[in-house]
């Protein structure tokens, strides 16, 4: 993907991930992870207005940069240190965090500093390297989102087939292929990136394409490969996941109602119900971090349920179902947020790039100045919203984050308070109740 270049005075250049530098005093514009930083002489406005816009943009740059670097570094550290989080999905999240961190580190400083200094001082090698890394980081981020969508679709909607190939070694191969494919796709950027003078002691890092047709073809190719096709795949995958989860909601409600009716009419014990081979969530996967529903095979001698130790009261069998319903609703909401944020962050940039490739003057008149700058800032924001959506809404990640912080900053042990005389005695643990259940079944003998 590439960003809009609005400087019409440089012939033969086009949008791309490099940072094309501004003339001194021009308003702050920026490039996204794959676009040029472009500047245009400021419109006739008051000095106070220009200074206010510049201050707002610099502040937004700083906030997004700190959130992107801090959030993605935290993800990398927590996922790397926590053994419990070394799963297939988290392997893709780790790759996504690395690509987002690369996007923030390799793009934003080389966008902001040349705007403030008025010229590109880093040389041709840095210009080509930054251009290439910007493109690779955005490509890896997009492909990682697609891989996560397909992995979750397989885990939830095709659980039996997914268990065969969903291993960490397979995820590692997919991640390596994602980085290699992105690296090959972005080879044209360093090839056609140059540093050229645009005025006395003013340099720009720009892309000089062979022709306008090549620039248009490249813009359409990136629009299809890195936005339209991934967006469709993600929308379809998460749509099918949402459909499966909502069907599971209705199935759980119907099956629990039937189970409670049998308990009331027959005096029996509620058991695990499976109708028509439809998948239901794994036992114990009631939390918000459950990421799949798997078919449970019936046991020959099911153990006595813990609820059988007490008489079934009104609503006692509905609590697990309510917990599962709430967990599934949270998953559906998170999936919708993922798709909406993806389109929200990248649709304006891709639309502007395509518009610029086919109608440069019209795009220049409409988007030069503050509009294109904030469009690019919106694309930068994707690097800091991904950690929030994928990890900070994950209960186990929050727990692992707290454990990591406690490990790095240990606190002195506190004295345990003594129990007061009027406190309730400790309740028996689940393990002791389980032993009681097993002993009861053993004494009763096989049914």
From Swiss-Prot:
Indicate the family of this protein.
Belongs to the G-protein coupled receptor 1 family.
This one is known as Gastrin/cholecystokinin type B receptor
Q: Where is the lipid attached (S-palmitoyl cysteine)?
A: 408
Tell me where in or outside the cell this protein is found: Cell membrane
Which InterPro entries does UniProt cross-reference here? Cholcskin_rcpt (IPR009126), Gastrin_rcpt (IPR000314), GPCR_Rhodpsn (IPR000276), GPCR_Rhodpsn_7TM (IPR017452)
Q: Where are the transmembrane segments?
A: 58-79, 88-109, 132-150, 171-189, 220-242, 334-355, 374-394
**What species does this protein belong to?**
Homo sapiens (Human)
Expressed in which tissues: Isoform 1 is expressed in brain, pancreas, stomach, the colon cancer cell line LoVo and the T-lymphoblastoma Jurkat, but not in heart, placenta, liver, lung, skeletal muscle, kidney or the stomach cancer cell line AGS. Expressed at high levels in the small cell lung cancer cell line NCI-H510, at lower levels in NCI-H345, NCI-H69 and GLC-28 cell lines, not expressed in GLC-19 cell line. Within the stomach, expressed at high levels in the mucosa of the gastric fundus and at low levels in the antrum and duodenum.
List the membrane topology term(s): Multi-pass membrane protein
